[in-house]
């Protein structure tokens, strides 16, 4: 249905978009609600006293991955790490890639930038500065429960791995980004 680089077969486009000739949603489709659904997921966050508490989010995703995304977030929520999430995004229609399919999630983008990895320190493409794996509890690392939970369901992380392998990308890393593609793209 979808290859490692994000090429979607005609059958896959029919399932994802309701049209074998379509390759993304623009957000203006009359039938968008037939394919993009709002789900609720629970996460942990940290209050001003430094205590963790449960948060419930509404997240827009493609109906084809809705149950899987719920299961991923339930896995993250139930993990002993109790990884905190204070910003979360799903479907958006500003590009033609996985977010516009409803098949990508961004987590804590302030701490987990989209970076140019050829500079030292890394230069944020979104934001103004970036440093790898900060001390922030919101920072996603290769060994975090978040990365493991998405990987368990075949989703990839845009942040690469502990050895700086970025799934075929050698100049950027998108630490906030998880996608239906195993490559994280």
Residue ranges with predicted function:
Residues 2, 70-74, 147:
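Generic detector of well-ordered alpha-helical segments enriched in charged/polar residues
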Residues 1-13:
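N-terminal secretory targeting signals
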